[in-house]
Amino acid sequence: MSVLREIGIIARALDSIANIEFRDIELARGQYLYLVRIAENPGIIQEELSELLKVDRSTVARSVKKLEAKGLVQKKAAKDNKKNKEWFVTEKGEKLYPFILAENAYSEEASLQGFSQAEVQALEKMLVRVRANITGDWEAVKKGQKRNY
């Protein structure tokens, strides 16, 4: 099996677990990702959220609109550019944040069970490098360019 296949399997398994567990707090598939990033980055705009999560802007727009309809996030016009909408977590959304963080911490601890601290640090460092390696391709393809393979 390839490294990317393993990363994909891990990501899908953890995402599936989270989606099932977050049904209890009325979060639909993948919405926890957006809620957490907005909570961590108050005032984030759609483009920044798109780049942070490596998803297209239309996906971000649909997801935050659903969170807004549930009263978990709210948008405000940016002071410096009225065309930009800044996103903030509401009081209702803030109440879910600790539960999501607890699930994330549990999943990380369970996933890394049996790894030494040095191994965890090395793995994180390598994964950051992998992400850096793909960022250029992601940005190029997002702008309509084709990769040469």
Model-derived features with residue positions:
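Short, locally clustered residues in the helix-turn-helix/winged-helix DNA-binding domain
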Residues: G8, V36-E40, L101
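Charged, amphipathic alpha-helical coiled-coil/dimerization segments
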Residues: K65-V128
